[in-house]
Curated annotation (Swiss-Prot):
InterPro entries: G_IRG_dom, Immunity-related_GTPase-like, IRG, P-loop_NTPase. This is Interferon-inducible GTPase 5. The keyword Nucleotide-binding applies. GTP binds at residues 62-69, 87-91, 169-171, 216-218. Residues 53-235 form the IRG-type G domain. Transmembrane segments: none annotated. It catalyses: GTP + H2O = GDP + phosphate + H(+). Residues 404-437 are annotated as: Disordered. Asthenozoospermic patients show a decrease in IRGC protein abundance in semen samples and a loss of colocalization with the mitochondria which suggests a role for IRGC in sperm motility. The lineage of its organism: Eukaryota, Metazoa, Chordata, Craniata, Vertebrata. Belongs to the TRAFAC class dynamin-like GTPase superfamily. IRG family.
Length: 463
């Protein structure tokens, strides 16, 4: 994710990890002061903030490439519909303009001015549109990939980011070729010629495996437009907490390892939130959130690792195998369905692990053990989610190996994280002397401080 601040789409809140940390800090303060109604309010804000992190997509290319028309087509809008991007024969985009994606409200398509247009000369374009702020790009061209497109592609690569190359107005190319060579005209051959030329130019710019889509914005049902939409949806999973990372293809072992590490942090936060909910004397709050949040989290892990039916079917198609063959190596009890019954069974099996987790945290926060003993479900939730995450990560690795088994042998690399996100695997240490009794609010405040300090330490190490 880009960390620089982008202009906020009017009427929408910009949800970021930083804001989640700020809410968690406010939650800790409310607990320590004993203000339970305020704590409940902050808790609900925290839950909402973890559900979405924005993904900013820059739609770039030269003036007249059809960027605005492509955005409208992707959003299912005509040029005259309310909220449609402005289109025209002259350059209509003078500054970056945001448009929300209809199926993914946390994804914003940014209509960027034309590269090399009078308002954005080539030598100032990258700085003027703040090119580095976008997470992903649609590089749009109305011709067979010239100097403007290769320069933009090289810049995207320099930033370590990805893009789709969208070649627009292929209907005009086909019509012109049909007129010029009526006797030997073959549509498929002309389209392949265009695709090959674009691929060659992009490879010359350093793009090893360019993703090329030939479209007509005026005929979105034809050519590669349906494939562009399905690829787009596949690469933008509904799990929005780590949008940029989670859109990486699951075929990559490195991607699996990164996904597991990121989701492991989410396990700790989810367990914390549910533990806090259990401690709040707010009638009905725990019942309303427990099952729903657990199921939501587990389904998110399931989709993120590509273990759902749609992801398996698409992967099977890509590698020329049957989806059933890939599914056969999945061992997790959540392979078929993440149901309330399955979650309850797994939750009930987590009591032993819960005590180990509680003892581990008790070494860092001596009062934590009494908090767990008082009925807090933190340990059981953490143990269950951690176990499910481990199983799904290993399943994703087995699926990857199965998908590639006809290629070079793939060693089954363990995806275990050494320290379970800071929770050691040993027993509890020797306790000290007697401590003065602390209120539940104070205990929860200490726990939240522990989590915040861990995050701050992690951030400082990354810097």
């Amino acid at each position: 994710m880009a960390t620089s601040k982008l202009p906020v789409v009017p009427g929408e809140e910009e949800n970021t990890i930083l804001m989640a940390k700020e809410r968690l800090e406010a939650l800790r303060t409310a607990f320590e002061s004993g203000d339970l109604p305020q704590a409940a309010s902050h808790l609900q804000e925290l839950l909402a903030s973890t559900e979405s992190i924005r993904l900013e997509v820059g739609v770039t290319g030269e003036s007249g490439a059809g960027k605005s028309s492509l955005i409208n087509a992707l959003r299912g809008l005509e040029a005259e519909d309310p909220g449609a991007a402005l289109t025209g024969v002259m350059e209509t985009t003078m500054q970056p303009s945001p448009y929300p994606h209809p199926q993914f409200p946390d994804v914003t398509l940014w209509d960027l001015p034309g590269a090399g247009s009078p308002g954005c000369p080539a030598d100032k374009y990258l700085k003027q549109v703040d090119f580095s702020r976008y997470d992903f790009f649609l590089l749009v061209s109305p011709r067979r990939c010239g100097a403007v497109e290769t320069r933009l592609a090289a810049e995207i690569l320099c930033q370590g980011k990805k893009f789709y190359f969208v070649r627009t107005k292929v209907d005009e190319d086909l019509a012109a070729t049909r007129t010029q060579r009526p006797s030997g005209f073959r549509e498929a051959a002309v389209l392949q010629e265009i695709r090959d030329h674009c691929a060659e130019r992009l490879r010359e710019a350093g793009v090893a495996d360019p993703r090329i889509f030939l479209v007509s914005n005026l005929s979105p049902a034809r050519y590669d437009f349906p494939t562009l939409v399905s690829t787009w949806e596949h690469d933008l999973p509904s799990h929005r907490r780590h949008a940029g990372l989670l859109s990486l293809p699951d075929i990559s072992l490195e991607a699996l390892q990164k996904k597991k590490a990121m989701l492991q942090e989410q396990v700790l936060k989810t367990a914390l939130v549910l533990g806090v909910i259990q401690a709040l004397p707010v009638p009905g709050l725990a019942a309303a959130y427990d099952d729903a949040l657990l199921i939501h989290s587990l389904r998110g892990y399931h989709r993120s690792f590509g273990l759902d039916d749609d992801s398996l079917a698409k992967l099977a198609e890509q590698v020329g195998k049957q989806a059933g063959d890939l599914r056969s190596v999945i061992r997790s009890p959540l392979a078929n369905e993440v149901s309330p019954e399955t979650v309850l069974r797994l939750y009930s099996q987590s009591s032993d692990g819960a005590m180990r987790v509680a003892r581990a945290f008790e070494r860092g926060i001596p009062v934590f053990g009494t908090l767990v003993a008082g009925g807090i479900s933190f340990g059981a939730v953490y143990t269950m989610l951690q176990g499910c995450l481990n199983e799904m990560a290993e399943d994703a690795q087995r699926v990857r190996i199965k998908a590639l088994e006809d290629d070079e042998p793939q060693p089954e690399v363990s995806l275990e994280v050494a320290s379970d996100n800071g929770v050691e695997k040993g027993g509890s240490g020797e306790g000290g002397g007697e401590e003065a009794p602390l209120s539940t609010c104070r205990k929860l405040g200490l726990l939240l401080k522990y989590i915040l300090d861990s995050w701050k330490k992690h951030d400082s190490e990354e810097k």
